[in-house]
Curated annotation (Swiss-Prot):
GO terms for cellular component: mitochondrion. It catalyses: L-seryl-[protein] + ATP = O-phospho-L-seryl-[protein] + ADP + H(+); L-threonyl-[protein] + ATP = O-phospho-L-threonyl-[protein] + ADP + H(+). This is Serine/threonine-protein kinase A-Raf. The keyword Hydrolase does not apply. GO terms for biological process: negative regulation of apoptotic process; regulation of proteasomal ubiquitin-dependent protein catabolic process; regulation of TOR signaling. It comes from Mus musculus (Mouse). Keywords: ATP-binding, Kinase, Metal-binding, Nucleotide-binding, Phosphoprotein, Proto-oncogene, Serine/threonine-protein kinase, Transferase, Zinc, Zinc-finger. PROSITE patterns: PROTEIN_KINASE_ATP (PS00107), PROTEIN_KINASE_DOM (PS50011), PROTEIN_KINASE_ST (PS00108), RBD (PS50898), ZF_DAG_PE_1 (PS00479), ZF_DAG_PE_2 (PS50081). A zinc finger (Phorbol-ester/DAG-type) spans 98-144. Residues 177-222, 241-288 are annotated as: Disordered. Interacts with TH1L/NELFD. Residues 272-287 have a biased composition (Basic and acidic residues). Its cofactor is Zn(2+).
Length: 604
C-alpha cells in the first residue's frame, strides 16, 4: 500500500512555530521537527529525510497512537499533531542496503562526490559507488540504495507505466520542453519538479562492477536523488516475476536472487551478481564507463530559479538581458534570448555548460551556475567595474600607454586561456571586457555557441551573429559551414586593440550598417590605422596590423600575441628606484666620518 503523495496546494505562507513533533526514522534514528501552522507532514519532514539520503516517495509515515501505528497521508497538516510521535519507515519493495566501505587509492583521476575536490586517498562504497575523503564521511547518506540489480528492468519496463495514474511522474516520460517550461496543476508540483533528478537511460545494458581495486565504480546510481516509489515497486515485482519464470537464468547460481534481495536488507558483505562475470579487458570497460555516467555533473551546477533573486536590469545585448541578482551574494544573471528551446538546443546548452564550468582564470568572469527553467540563463560573478567600452567611448577615461598595453596583455592572456580550453568566444568586443577593481581585465559572455547560433527547428542556420564592428570578413560572408575559429576571435581582438590605441571606434565615418557589412566582407574596408596614437610602440602597431589581416590564415594566434606583448612590456623604459641608500632623514652627526666620532669619544 502506498500512501498519498504531496502536500496540499496552498498559497499561504507558513506562520510561526507552535510546538514540536518527535519523529522516529529508519536505521534507529530519530529527530524532533518544529510544528508550524499551514505546513504539512511532507514539508516538515522534507529536510530531515533529505540529509539522510531518503525521500518521501520511498517512505511511509505512521502516527503512533497508544502504541499502535496508523498510516498517515503525507499531505496531513502538521499543526494538529503537536506533541504526538511519528514513525517513518522505508517501503518494503525498495531495495535498501547498508554501505560497504573500503579504503581505496584512486590512481586514475577521481573526485569526491561531496566536496567535488581531487581524490587520491579515500573511501568507496562497493555497493552504491560513493567515493569520498575521510573528512567528508559525515556527509554520506546513512542508507545505501543499490539499483544495480534492477536497473536494466527499470528501463525495459518504464514504457508499461504510460497508462498509469502517475504517468507524468516517470522520469523517462518527461520531455525536454516539459522540463524547460514550468507547468503543472500546483505551484508545489512545479517546485518539486525543479529538484527532480531522472536516471540517464543507457544505450547499452548497464555494466556491472567487476570486483577490483583499480578503478572506482562510476556508473552506480546515487542515493541522494529522489526516486519514485511506484516505479521501484513495479520494477522489483516485474524483475522477481521474470527471474522466477526463467528458472534461475536471471541470476547466477550460488548468489541470492534479486527477488530475495528486494524483500529485505542485504548483508554488507553479500556478493553481487557481477562478481561471477568474466573479467573484460580494460579498454572495453573504459568505453562502457564513458557511456554510462554515474551522475550527470551538470546536476551540481543547475540552480533552481527559486534561489535566485533578480534585483536590477543592467542592459540588453545581442543574445540576452543582464540583471544584477542575489545568489549567495551579488551575481550577474544573463537571461538568454531563446524562445521555446528545442530538445537539441537544450542538450547542446547543457553540454556547453559542462565546458564553461571548468573555466578558472584571473582574466575570465567566474562561471557560477546556470538555469534551464523557465528559460536559459547563466550566473556569473558580479563585476563592480565598468566595461572597456564605457571607459573609452562614454566616460572618456584617459589611460597612459603603459596602462593600455597592460589591458591588451591581460585580454590576450584571458583569450589564450579560453582557446587552450577549446572555447571560441564568438562575440569578443569592448562591451564584454570589464575592468574590475582598478585595471584587472575580466572577459565575459564567452562560449555560448548554442545561443549565438540561429536555429530553425532542430538545425542551426548559417547566419552571422555578433556585433558588426568586431566581425571578421569570413564570418560576414558565411561561406563555410562554421566560420567561427580562433582566428575570428583574433580579428575581434584586433578591433579591441584599435579601440585602445586610437580611443575611437572603427568606421565612425560610415553610418550605414549594411554598407559596413558589404565592404568589410569583400575586403574593401579596414580600420584606419592613421588614427593610432603617436606614442604607440612600433611593435604594437605591427601586431595590430597582423590581427586585422583579411585572410584568417595570416593572423597570429593568441600564444604568439601574448608573447609579443609581454616582450614589448619588458622593453618599455621604466623609472626604477635608485639602489643607493636615501639620505633624506639623516642627522648631521650621521654625516661625520666614523673616525672623528671615535676620536671624539676618546676625549676626556
Amino acid at each position: 500500500m502506498e500512501p498519498p503523495r504531496g502536500p496540499p496546494v496552498s498559497g499561504a505562507e507558513p506562520s510561526r512555530a507552535v510546538g514540536t513533533v518527535k519523529v522516529y526514522l529508519p536505521n534507529k534514528q530519530r529527530t524532533v521537527v518544529t510544528v508550524r501552522e499551514g505546513m504539512s507532514v511532507y514539508d516538515s519532514l522534507d529536510k530531515a529525510l533529505k540529509v539522510r539520503g531518503l525521500n518521501q516517495d520511498c517512505c511511509v509515515v505512521y502516527r503512533l497512537i497508544k502504541g499502535r501505528k496508523t498510516v498517515t497521508a503525507w499531505d496531513t497538516a502538521i499543526a494538529p499533531l503537536d506533541g504526538e510521535e511519528l514513525i517513518v519507515e522505508v517501503l518494503e519493495d525498495v531495495p535498501l542496503t547498508m554501505h560497504n566501505f573500503v579504503r581505496k587509492t584512486f590512481f586514475s583521476l577521481a573526485f569526491c562526490d561531496f566536496c567535488l575536490k581531487f581524490l587520491f586517498h579515500g573511501f568507496r562504497c562497493q555497493t552504491c559507488g560513493y567515493k569520498f575523503h575521510q573528512h567528508c564521511s559525515s556527509k554520506v547518506p546513512t542508507v545505501c540504495v543499490d539499483m544495480s540489480t534492477n536497473r536494466r528492468q527499470f528501463y525495459h519496463s518504464i514504457q508499461d507505466l504510460s497508462g498509469g495514474s502517475r504517468q507524468q511522474e516517470a522520469p523517462s516520460n518527461l520531455s525536454v520542453n516539459e522540463l524547460l517550461t514550468p507547468q503543472g496543476p500546483s505551484p508545489f508540483t512545479q517546485q518539486r519538479d525543479q529538484e527532480h533528478f531522472s536516471f540517464p537511460a543507457p544505450a547499452n545494458p548497464p555494466l556491472q562492477r567487476i570486483r577490483s581495486t583499480s578503478t572506482p565504480n562510476v556508473h552506480m546510481v546515487s542515493t541522494t536523488a529522489p526516486m519514485d516509489s511506484s516505479l521501484m515497486q513495479f520494477t522489483a515485482q516485474s524483475f522477481s516475476t521474470d527471474a522466477a519464470g526463467r528458472g534461475g537464468d536471471g541470476a547466477p547460481r550460488g548468489s541470492p536472487s534479486p527477488a530475495s534481495v528486494s524483500s529485505g536488507r542485504k548483508s554488507p558483505h553479500s556478493k553481487l551478481p557481477s562478481e561471477q562475470r568474466e573479467r573484460k579487458s580494460l579498454a572495453d570497460e573504459k568505453k562502457k564507463v564513458k557511456n554510462l555516467g554515474y551522475r550527470d555533473s551538470g546536476y551540481y551546477w543547475e540552480v533552481p530559479p527559486s534561489e535566485v533573486q533578480l534585483l536590477k536590469r543592467i542592459g540588453t545585448g545581442s543574445f540576452g538581458t543582464v540583471f544584477r541578482g542575489r545568489w549567495h551574494g551579488d551575481v550577474a544573471v544573463k537571461v538568454l534570448k531563446v524562445a521555446q528551446p528545442t530538445a537539441e538546443q537544450a542538450q547542446a546548452f547543457k553540454n556547453e555548460m559542462q565546458v564553461l564550468r571548468k573555466t578558472r582564470h584571473v582574466n575570465i568572469l567566474l562561471f557560477m551556475g546556470f538555469m534551464t527553467r523557465p528559460g536559459f540563463a547563466i550566473i556569473t560573478q558580479w563585476c563592480e567595474g565598468s566595461s572597456l567600452y564605457h571607459h573609452l567611448h562614454v566616460a572618456d577615461t584617459r589611460f597612459d600607454m603603459v596602462q593600455l598595453i597592460d589591458v591588451a596583455r591581460q585580454t590576450a592572456q584571458g583569450m589564450d586561456y579560453l582557446h587552450a580550453k577549446n572555447i571560441i568566444h564568438r562575440d569578443l568586443k569592448s562591451n564584454n571586457i570589464f575592468l574590475h577593481e582598478g585595471l584587472t581585465v575580466k572577459i565575459g559572455d564567452f562560449g555560448l555557441a548554442t545561443v549565438k547560433t540561429r536555429w530553425s527547428g532542430a538545425q542551426p542556420l548559417e547566419q552571422p551573429s555578433g556585433s558588426v564592428l568586431w566581425m571578421a570578413a569570413e564570418v560576414i560572408r558565411m561561406q563555410d559551414p562554421n566560420p567561427y575559429s580562433f582566428q575570428s576571435d583574433v580579428y575581434a581582438y584586433g578591433v579591441v586593440l584599435y579601440e585602445l590605441m586610437t580611443g575611437s571606434l572603427p568606421y565612425s565615418h560610415i553610418g550605414s550598417r549594411d554598407q559596413i557589412i558589404f565592404m568589410v566582407g569583400r575586403g574593401y574596408l579596414s580600420p584606419d590605422l592613421s588614427k593610432i596614437f603617436s606614442n604607440c610602440p612600433k611593435a604594437m602597431r605591427r601586431l595590430l596590423t597582423d590581427c586585422l589581416k583579411f585572410q584568417r590564415e595570416e593572423r597570429p594566434l593568441f600564444p604568439q600575441i601574448l608573447a609579443t606583448i609581454e616582450l614589448l612590456q619588458r622593453s618599455l623604459p621604466k623609472i626604477e628606484r635608485s639602489a643607493s641608500e636615501p639620505s633624506l632623514h639623516r642627522t648631521q652627526a650621521d654625516e661625520l666620518p666614523a673616525c672623528l666620532l671615535s676620536a671624539a669619544r676618546l676625549v676626556p
